[in-house]
Amino acid sequence: MVADPPRDSKGLAAAEPTANGGLALASIEDQGAAAGGYCGSRDQVRRCLRANLLVLLTVVAVVAGVALGLGVSGAGGALALGPERLSAFVFPGELLLRLLRMIILPLVVCSLIGGAASLDPGALGRLGAWALLFFLVTTLLASALGVGLALALQPGAASAAINASVGAAGSAENAPSKEVLDSFLDLARNIFPSNLVSAAFRSYSTTYEERNITGTRVKVPVGQEVEGMNILGLVVFAIVFGVALRKLGPEGELLIRFFNSFNEATMVLVSWIMWYAPVGIMFLVAGKIVEMEDVGLLFARLGKYILCCLLGHAIHGLLVLPLIYFLFTRKNPYRFLWGIVTPLATAFGTSSSSATLPLMMKCVEENNGVAKHISRFILPIGATVNMDGAALFQCVAAVFIAQLSQQSLDFVKIITILVTATASSVGAAGIPAGGVLTLAIILEAVNLPVDHISLILAVDWLVDRSCTVLNVEGDALGAGLLQNYVDRTESRSTEPELIQVKSELPLDPLPVPTEEGNPLLKHYRGPAGDATVASEKESVM
């Protein structure tokens, strides 16, 4: 038995001579920690699990949903789910979708108004230009990757087998087609909504009617409002409205504070919804698998096409986008991706970029250190215009259908597919059944038959989820790149350009008490840290 070293009155071990003649003091607590290293590591594991509990629950929910769906669909008999029982089975997932969609409108409008009002017009223009450039370049890269993979893997080479098995369904279920010009005109119309209230739940879309004009049947375009939020129009209005509030100067500060407070309250709701997300995701994934009649046969027939899409999404999401992030920031991109695992899993479960937006904002701000005025300005724009996954999938599908129809694609047609996929993916968020309708636009642009889109619809439930994951990953990495740009700009300048730096005395008509926690106030504490010495109000001029 080893005797304890002598201790002083403060619990420190007696001083022992060191090799250089000095004295070393070791506390009893340090010795206990060294002796109980196993307990310390166990505490570290416990803290790590507690910190990443939501991430682990979300990933487990996806795996459990796949297992549950395969188990229920394979059991049959008494466990077979008809349409009425299936709707009850997926009800927890439906609740999650409804909760997330409830948050989208106030979150997008308030965050964009507050973000646009917090930046001077020059900084706003620079941030917007860099964001759009990043989104455009990555979408073009995704489109090129999709075309290259489809030409290399030849997913539509086995045309005879696929046509024999599902050719009848393809001829019976034609997807709605739209002229390319009308599609881009609809995009422009949705940018400028005629009614902001109806834009919250309706968007403009052109349909066609056959009319008898001078004895001939003519297809006439007819505009109508269809179900689906016009998020593109709301984004444009919110940005312009935020700039207008900034131009008002002191008169607009009260309204800016209102939108900032509204946005903070919305984020509190998001933090509550996040803990229900794993339950909803599990039942959404399981319900979609149960809904498919024969998953194994479907993969056997279209496995090469599915492989091409998923492989393209994996290459773009795990190699291309992280490489771009690393080249510009010199930071580990995979550490950044670990911080957004929860919204990525939510994107897979909900298959909606907009529904994932609240969780993505919270995670990039809290886990990856992106400033609020950047994340809440860039992420809503990215959810609207950045569709890397959709562009890649549409290019693969277009080449797949061309191979299926035994039509060759020359250089001009390939360039047309790339440009059309990049441009049409911008408006996909504002179009009901977005991905499939924009695919019809691409097929029309290169004179390919649209009747084979039914094959794409058969596996869209899986490919679309992969598209959504890639879309939201691109949004988050774009926000991280812009945060790095802002940090470098501020480090070069004594007066940061991208935040308000102009100070003025508080206005007498609108005194703001410090207890309100106003984001437009900066509080400074004295040397003792016991009282506020001065406060500045950041000008919105």
Curated annotation (Swiss-Prot):
Catalytic activity: L-glutamine(out) + L-serine(in) + Na(+)(out) = L-glutamine(in) + L-serine(out) + Na(+)(in); L-glutamine(in) + L-serine(out) + Na(+)(out) = L-glutamine(out) + L-serine(in) + Na(+)(in); L-threonine(in) + L-glutamine(out) + Na(+)(out) = L-threonine(out) + L-glutamine(in) + Na(+)(in); L-threonine(out) + L-glutamine(in) + Na(+)(out) = L-threonine(in) + L-glutamine(out) + Na(+)(in)
Intervals, Cytoplasmic compartment: 1-51, 117-130, 249-257, 329-333, 365-373, 483-541
GO term, biological process aspect, one: erythrocyte differentiation
pH and activity: Optimum pH is 7.
Phosphothreonine PTM sites in chain numbering: 494
Entry annotated with the keyword Nucleotide-binding: no
Modified residues annotated as Phosphoserine in this record: 493, 503, 535, 539
Record key words, sorted: Acetylation, Amino-acid transport, Antiport, Cell membrane, Glycoprotein, Host cell receptor for virus entry, Host-virus interaction, Membrane, Metal-binding, Phosphoprotein, Receptor, Sodium, Symport, Transmembrane, Transmembrane helix, Transport
Subcellular compartments: Cell membrane; Melanosome
UniProt-annotated binding residues for Na(+) 2: 384
Membrane protein topology class: Multi-pass membrane protein
Tissues expressing the protein: Placenta, lung, skeletal muscle, kidney, pancreas, and intestine. Expressed in CD34-positive hematopoietic progenitors (at protein level).
Major localization class: membrane
Claim: Signal is one of the keywords in the record: no
Cellular component terms per the entry's GO annotation: basal plasma membrane; centriolar satellite; ciliary basal body; extracellular exosome; melanosome; membrane; plasma membrane
Intramembrane region spans per record: 334-364, 414-447
Glycosylation-annotated residues: 163, 212
Subunit-level organization: Homotrimer. Interacts with ERVH48-1/suppressyn; may negatively regulate syncytialization.
PANTHER family: NEUTRAL AMINO ACID TRANSPORTER B(0), SODIUM/DICARBOXYLATE SYMPORTER-RELATED
Protein name, UniProt field: Neutral amino acid transporter B(0)
Species, as recorded: Homo sapiens (Human)
Name of the gene encoding the protein in the UniProt record: SLC1A5
